[in-house]
Amino acid sequence: MAERKYFGTDGVRGKVGSYPITPDFVLKLGWAAGKVLATQGTGKVLIGKDTRISGYMLESALEAGLAAAGLSAAFTGPMPTPAIAYLTRTFRSEAGIVISASHNPFYDNGIKFFSAQGTKLPDDVEEAIEAMLEQPMDCVESAKLGRASRINDAAGRYIEFCKSTFPAHLSLDKYKIVVDCANGATYHIAPNVMRELGAEVIEIGTQPDGMNINENCGATDIKALQNQVLETKADIGLAYDGDGDRLIMVDHFGNKVDGDQILFIIAREALRSGNLKGGVVGTLMSNMSLELALKQLGIPFVRANVGDRYVLEKMQEYNWILGGENSGHIIIADKNTTGDGVIASLAVLAAMVQHKLSLNELASAVKLFPQVLINVRFAGGANPLESDAVKAVATEVEKQLAGKGRILLRKSGTEPLIRVMVECEDAELAQLSAEKIAEAVRSN
């Protein structure tokens, strides 16, 4: 695979106003993508965004670039990333484009592409777009320029799709649910889905102003949700991130229920109903307790690299339908082609209603081992993980943990950091072990 200049694991991302998230680059990116995608299909691209103020600027730039290449753009307005994956398929679009930086602050943004099938673009297509970016920009003749249109009922279409994944014989009419939409793309989706299925809904994080996305709310900061669940005596709390592809839950005691526990609940329910189709894909960061709990049920488990892209690739490799990350990306491939926070929450709620059990009771089968994560900054140059001294300390720690835990050492893909993770039933041993390895990395 060729070295990427612009595309990371989740498209093109960065700080707004700094290259490559500038109007001129995004214009060129739209043109390059248009040139590559215009070779076949409908000549139509779907564009959605989250609630960042910069989304207006970037969608205009994308539209101009696509039109210059001869492709038409249809805009959905603020819409969760998984909604764009779904709508790209139903509108038979050539591709879907999401303008979002997911769980990042408002001053970041990004451009992510979906194929006509609603999956991440194949590597060869991304490489072709990168190659086209190196060419001088031109413009098709006037009669062949692309047009722009707006899809006014996009939200309603996606709401109905989400509801269709919830069993028709079940209802949420006995549940009080707090929904935290991170002032992001699910603000007009998730509360309506839950209400239309019968729930009493209390909303937080549903007043986006362009700059408050993910700010002290959502899946990356659940304190406000925990407080609201306890204050209102709600049955459950749901937290999505800025673009709606992550879910973190809170039980009625205010306890966090993370992606590993959510994945287990959905896997166990799929096993009971005969819909599991194979095993479950986690990541290198998935808690060891998830692996052990699945093993007790006889459910196979494999680990992919961190990132929902790699989880999906591993799922496709094994032809399995369920995978996810502890951060809350949950992919249920027989329902949608990417991580979908709203659909994952409905899968857990269905299990609660079906068995008349609380979230706390459902999640209790996975007692998460303490995880200690230390980020060690290094000055660049040689990778400290290649050092014999660091390898020796890591081997020594692994022997001490011997079946009671595990270590994971990896270099960040975006910053000069070594991430040291130690997981163990004994929290004190995990802390000491992580500090020992981190010190070896610093001293290298």
From Swiss-Prot:
Phosphoserine, modified sites: 102
Keywords in alphabetical order: Isomerase, Magnesium, Metal-binding, Phosphoprotein
Assigned EC number: 5.4.2.10
Catalytic activity line of the entry: alpha-D-glucosamine 1-phosphate = D-glucosamine 6-phosphate
InterPro entries reported for this sequence: A-D-PHexomutase_a/b/a-I, A-D-PHexomutase_a/b/a-I/II/III, A-D-PHexomutase_a/b/a-II, A-D-PHexomutase_a/b/a-III, A-D-PHexomutase_C, A-D-PHexomutase_C_sf, A-D-PHexomutase_CS, Alpha-D-phosphohexomutase_SF
Gene Ontology BP term (one): peptidoglycan biosynthetic process
PANTHER family, sorted: PHOSPHOGLUCOMUTASE (ALPHA-D-GLUCOSE-1,6-BISPHOSPHATE-DEPENDENT) (PTHR42946:SF1), PHOSPHOHEXOSE MUTASE (PTHR42946)
The protein's name: Phosphoglucosamine mutase
Gene coding for it: glmM
